[in-house]
C-alpha cells in the first residue's frame, strides 16, 4: 500500500501566507506569537508516526491541535512540530455495543448529528465547534454534566501513537496507565490520541428550554430561587445561570437558562413546569417551554461566541460549603461593559460519592467561569487582569477547591488542577512515556510556549 506524501509545511521555506493560515487555525484570535518549526496535517497514522520521528530528529517539542477551539491556544509552541489533526477523521458506530469510535478532530456537532441517525446521544461540549480531543482529555464538562457525568467517564478505550512512534491500544486491561491519564490529564497526556472509543446514551427525541432574563440587581432573588428548586428538578434538565453584558444589553443582566431532554412534548412540558410556574417576577424576557434542539443551541452559542474574536477565560470549582450567593455576587453583578461582551457562568455539578478511577479528580457542586469577549488587542491586559484578579481574590478567601485544567493559566494563576495523588501519578506516567518531555510540560514546566 502506498502511503500518501506527508502533508507538511516547514517554517523556513513555506509561503508565508500559507504557513500563517496553517499556524493560526485557532478559534481564539488572541493567540501566542509562537512559530512552530513545522506544521503537519496528517491523514493517516503513518503520518503521525512520522511526526514523532521528525520531532526527535530536530530535537523539537511536539504540539497537538484537534478542533482548534482551545481558548488557551496550547497548540502553539515555539519551534515545535505541530500536528494538526484537522484532516485526520474517522467516525464509526458499533450497533452491538453502542460504542462510537472517533478521531480527535471530530466536533461536538458532527458527533451528535452522526449519533442521532443511530438514535444515540453523547454529552458533548456545549459548543458545536469543539473538537473532541482536548475536550475529552481535559475531562469534558459537557451537556448536562450534573446528571450525565463528565464526558471522559464514557471512555472505554483509546488508541494512541507514543512520542517514540509506537501504536498502542489503551484500556483498563491494556496500557492501563495511559487509559487512566486519558481521562483528565489534559495537556499533560504524554501521547497522541488517534481514536477515542466512547459509550453512548439513548437519544431522547424532544428538547425544550426555558429562558428568563432579569436586571442584575435581581441577582440574589434569582440565585435563591434556583438553589431552592434545584433538588426537585429532573435529572434530564440542565440548569445554568449567566451574568452578562453584550452590545445590546447596556446594563448587566442575569439569565436563567434550562433545557430538558424528554421522550415527548408532554413529558418535557411537565418536567419544566416547576420552572415556569415558580420563577421570580420582573423578568425582562420570559420564554417558557420553547422547542429547540442541541444543534439550535449550538447556533445560538455561536452567535454569542463567534470565531475570530479575542477571548480570555478562567473556570473554577468552589470549595464545598461555600455560600455560592455571596461568593459570586461581585462577578455576576459588576461585569465590565465592552464592545463584545463579558460573561459569568454558573452550572451545578452533582457530587457523586465516588468518581471512576481516572486522572480527573477535582470537582465540586458548583462550577463557575468568567469570560471576556472583545476585538481590540490593546485590551488584552485589561481583560486578562479583571478575570484573574477576581479568582485570585476568591482563592485568598479559601473559596476555590480547584481550577478546570482546560482553562488553566499555570504562569499567571497557578492552582490545583488534580488531586495531589492524581497529579503525582500524571507526572510519573509522563516521565515513563515521554521521558524527553517532547509533548508534556504545558502545566508542569515553564517556558514551554
Curated annotation (Swiss-Prot):
<dbReference type="InterPro" id="IPR016169">
    <property type="entry name" value="FAD-bd_PCMH_sub2"/>
</dbReference>
<dbReference type="InterPro" id="IPR050416">
    <property type="entry name" value="FAD-linked_Oxidoreductase"/>
</dbReference>
<keyword id="KW-0560">Oxidoreductase</keyword>
<dbReference type="GO" id="GO:0016491">
    <property type="term" value="F:oxidoreductase activity"/>
</dbReference>
<dbReference type="InterPro" id="IPR036318">
    <property type="entry name" value="FAD-bd_PCMH-like_sf"/>
</dbReference>
<keyword id="KW-0274">FAD</keyword>
<keyword id="KW-0285">Flavoprotein</keyword>
<comment type="similarity">
    <text>Belongs to the oxygen-dependent FAD-linked oxidoreductase family.</text>
</comment>
<protein>
    <recommendedName>
        <fullName>FAD-linked oxidoreductase janO</fullName>
        <ecNumber>1.1.1.-</ecNumber>
    </recommendedName>
</protein>
<feature type="domain" description="FAD-binding PCMH-type">
    <location>
        <begin position="32"/>
        <end position="203"/>
    </location>
</feature>
<dbReference type="GO" id="GO:0071949">
    <property type="term" value="F:FAD binding"/>
</dbReference>
<dbReference type="InterPro" id="IPR016166">
    <property type="entry name" value="FAD-bd_PCMH"/>
</dbReference>
<comment type="function">
    <text>FAD-linked oxidoreductase; part of the gene cluster that mediates the biosynthesis of the indole diterpenes janthitremanes such as shearinine K or shearinine A. The geranylgeranyl diphosphate (GGPP) synthase janG catalyzes the first step in janthitremane biosynthesis via conversion of farnesyl pyrophosphate and isopentyl pyrophosphate into geranylgeranyl pyrophosphate (GGPP). Condensation of indole-3-glycerol phosphate with GGPP by the prenyl transferase janC then forms 3-geranylgeranylindole (3-GGI).</text>
</comment>
<dbReference type="Pfam" id="PF01565">
    <property type="entry name" value="FAD_binding_4"/>
</dbReference>
<comment type="pathway">
    <text>Secondary metabolite biosynthesis.</text>
</comment>
<dbReference type="InterPro" id="IPR006094">
    <property type="entry name" value="Oxid_FAD_bind_N"/>
</dbReference>
<dbReference type="InterPro" id="IPR016167">
    <property type="entry name" value="FAD-bd_PCMH_sub1"/>
</dbReference>
Amino acid at each position: 500500500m502506498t502511503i500518501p506524501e506527508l502533508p507538511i509545511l516547514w517554517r523556513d521555506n513555506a509561503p508565508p501566507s500559507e504557513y500563517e493560515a496553517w499556524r493560526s487555525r485557532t478559534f481564539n484570535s488572541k493567540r501566542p506569537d509562537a512559530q512552530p518549526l513545522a506544521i503537519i496535517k496528517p491523514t493517516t497514522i503513518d503520518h503521525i508516526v512520522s511526526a514523532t520521528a521528525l520531532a526527535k530528529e530536530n530535537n523539537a517539542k511536539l504540539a497537538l491541535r484537534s478542533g482548534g477551539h482551545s481558548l488557551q491556544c496550547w497548540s502553539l509552541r515555539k519551534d515545535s512540530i505541530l500536528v494538526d489533526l484537522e484532516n485526520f477523521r474517522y467516525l464509526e458506530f458499533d450497533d452491538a455495543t453502542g460504542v462510537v469510535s472517533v478521531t480527535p478532530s471530530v466536533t461536538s456537532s458532527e458527533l451528535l448529528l452522526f449519533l442521532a441517525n443511530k438514535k444515540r446521544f453523547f454529552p458533548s461540549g456545549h459548543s458545536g465547534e469543539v473538537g473532541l480531543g482536548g475536550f475529552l482529555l481535559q475531562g469534558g464538562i459537557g451537556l448536562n454534566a450534573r446528571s450525565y457525568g463528565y464526558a471522559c467517564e464514557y471512555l472505554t478505550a483509546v488508541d494512541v501513537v507514543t512520542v517514540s512512534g509506537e501504536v498502542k491500544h489503551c484500556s483498563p486491561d491494556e496500557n492501563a496507565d495511559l487509559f487512566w491519564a486519558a481521562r483528565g490529564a489534559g495537556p499533560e497526556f504524554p501521547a497522541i490520541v488517534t481514536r477515542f472509543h466512547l459509550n453512548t446514551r439513548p437519544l431522547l427525541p424532544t428538547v425544550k428550554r426555558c429562558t428568563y432574563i432579569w436586571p442584575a440587581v435581581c441577582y440574589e432573588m434569582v440565585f435563591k430561587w434556583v438553589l431552592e428548586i434545584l433538588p426537585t428538578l429532573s435529572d434530564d434538565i440542565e440548569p445554568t445561570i449567566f451574568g452578562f453584558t453584550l452590545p445590546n444589553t447596556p446594563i448587566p443582566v442575569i439569565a436563567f437558562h434550562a433545557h430538558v431532554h424528554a421522550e415527548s412534548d408532554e413529558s418535557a412540558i411537565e418536567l419544566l413546569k416547576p420552572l415556569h410556574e415558580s420563577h421570580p417576577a420582573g423578568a425582562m424576557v420570559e420564554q417558557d417551554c420553547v422547542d429547540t434542539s442541541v444543534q439550535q443551541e449550538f447556533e445560538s452559542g455561536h452567535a454569542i461566541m463567534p470565531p475570530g474574536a479575542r477571548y480570555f477565560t478562567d473556570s473554577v470549582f468552589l470549595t464545598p460549603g461555600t455560600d455560592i450567593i455571596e461568593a459570586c455576587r461581585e462577578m455576576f453583578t459588576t461585569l465590565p461593559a465592552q464592545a463584545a461582551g463579558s460573561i459569568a457562568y454558573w452550572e451545578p455539578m452533582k457530587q457523586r460519592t465516588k468518581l471512576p478511577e481516572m486522572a480527573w479528580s477535582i470537582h465540586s457542586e458548583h462550577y463557575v467561569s468568567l469570560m471576556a469577549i472583545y476585538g481590540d488587542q490593546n485590551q488584552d491586559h485589561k481583560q486578562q487582569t479583571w478575570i484573574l484578579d477576581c479568582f485570585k481574590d476568591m482563592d485568598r478567601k479559601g473559596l476555590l477547591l480547584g481550577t478546570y485544567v482546560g482553562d488553566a493559566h499555570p504562569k499567571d494563576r497557578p492552582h490545583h488542577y488534580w488531586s495531589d495523588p492524581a497529579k503525582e501519578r500524571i507526572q510519573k506516567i509522563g516521565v515513563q512515556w515521554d521521558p524527553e518531555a517532547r509533548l508534556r510540560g504545558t502545566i508542569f514546566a515553564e517556558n514551554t510556549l
